[in-house]
Amino acid sequence: MRLLVYGAGVTGSLFSARLHEAGHDVSLLARGERLAALRRDGVQLAQGDSPAARRVPVPVVEHPADGYDVIAVFVRAHQVDAVLEPLAGLEGDVVFLLNWAGGPEPLGAVIGPGRVLLGFPTAAGTMDGDVVRYRAANALTRRRWPTIRTRSAA
């Protein structure tokens, strides 16, 4: 299964690095200076205040493209509208992992109602230059809203 992580901030970088280290086929979408840093150094992770940072060579892309089975979106709520249009033309389910109270309907109206999943990552961290400093956590909440297809099967 091919995964695209859309958003190279703290949580997107952390999740993509962890998925890559676990052997999954994952790419990380980034732009601008963050893209250049990731191409040069990979995702750099440091737990807490540790002076040691490890480099994880997650493949990075600048633009979303077809060929991914799942796209995990790690952006802030005010950035969602900007990513919907590029996602609408792609295949694969889209998991929105952010603080989103609007429900799946406005997202599904643009990208297709059967493709939307919502979740909330329980990871904490901060950017220290190009290094992601994180606190260890192992939980992810998720919910798939029933679609016409899943309601009729129930």
Residue ranges and their predicted role:
Residues A37, L90, A109-R115, D130-A154:
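Internal alpha-helical scaffold of NAD(P)-dependent oxidoreductase catalytic cores
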Residues A52-R133:
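Rossmann-like NAD(P)(H) cofactor-binding subdomain of soluble oxidoreductases
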Residues V5, L28-R31, V73-F74, L97, ...:
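Active-site-adjacent beta-strand anchor residues
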Residues G7-G12, G42, W100-G102, G119, ...:
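Glycine-centered flexibility sites
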Residues R31, W100, I148-S152:
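A structural signal for well-ordered alpha-helical scaffolds and beta->alpha junctions
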Residues A46, V61, R143-R144:
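Residues in well-ordered beta-strands of folded domains
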Residues M1-P51:
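NAD(P)+-binding Rossmann beta1-loop-alpha1 motif at the extreme N-terminus of oxidoreductases
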Residues F15, G103, R151-A154:
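Generic structural signal for hydrophobic residues
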